[in-house]
Amino acid sequence: MAIPFLHKGGSDDSTHHHTHDYDHHNHDHHGHDHHSHDSSSNSSSEAARLQFIQEHGHSHDAMETPGSYLKRELPQFNHRDFSRRAFTIGVGGPVGSGKTALLLQLCRLLGEKYSIGVVTNDIFTREDQEFLIRNKALPEERIRAIETGGCPHAAIREDVSGNLVALEELQSEFNTELLLVESGGDNLAANYSRDLADFIIYVIDVSGGDKIPRKGGPGITESDLLIINKTDLAKLVGADLSVMDRDAKKIRENGPIVFAQVKNQVGMDEITELILGAAKSAGALK
């Protein structure tokens, strides 16, 4: 059977090209210890910035704060039609943090009771989809892949149309009750659009050190659930779990945090309870 695979996220013009060609400074030194920034330099920089946005598909605006759990954007369920697209869980996080392993465990734990579909996002490959199929997470026709061809966050935030189409197709074909979306590995500033994800999970792991939670960023601060994965490696990498716990609680304003070993199913009961609780509160599940 051919593996369902969608090339590129969104419309044809949503492919993202990186052409960072900024001419920020025009330095003309005439024996003096100063910098000359003329208006033509400023205008050319602005023109380059606008060209970058046009070619890239979106801008990378600076954030003034690391975000806030209490002030995060919440899903709006008043007009949400779960018969068109089931309750959607978005899973994000850096490369190698354990996102795909989490999807595998969720499919195994929830797939026996609920109708589930999965959409994975990769830049140029379908490795995550193939991993899930190879490990029999679900029947392979329920696992779709999108090749974003550019910044992973663009397909889950700026232009979510490709993911929405794939999810709605799964809904139409299998009458799904829960849908899972995995973002390509990205940085701490990446997060899901509420147009796509009803419940946002962000996965980090201890291998980056115990400083990661306090670095913040929308993924850590504004996700509905933060998972700190691979706790069994803490001693090996010199990470202090108590420090991670303290910093995560502070920056997330006591929002939900689960310390986990996803591969070993440690913490999975709590994770599934939080997901199902959110889906039931939204009216998506009874």
UniProtKB/Swiss-Prot annotation:
GO terms for cellular component: cytosol; nucleus. Signal peptide: none annotated. It holds the Pfam family cobW. It is found in: Cytoplasm; Nucleus. Keywords: Chaperone, Cytoplasm, GTP-binding, Nickel insertion, Nucleotide-binding, Nucleus. CDD domains: UreG (cd05540). GTP binds at G93, P94, V95, G96, S97, G98, K99, T100. Residues 9-26 have a biased composition (Basic and acidic residues). One of its GO terms (molecular function) is GTPase activity. Its main location: cytoplasm. GO terms for biological process: urea catabolic process; urea metabolic process. Residues 1-47 are annotated as: Disordered. Probably facilitates nickel incorporation. Belongs to the SIMIBI class G3E GTPase family. UreG subfamily. This is Uncharacterized urease accessory protein ureG-like. It comes from Schizosaccharomyces pombe (strain 972 / ATCC 24843).
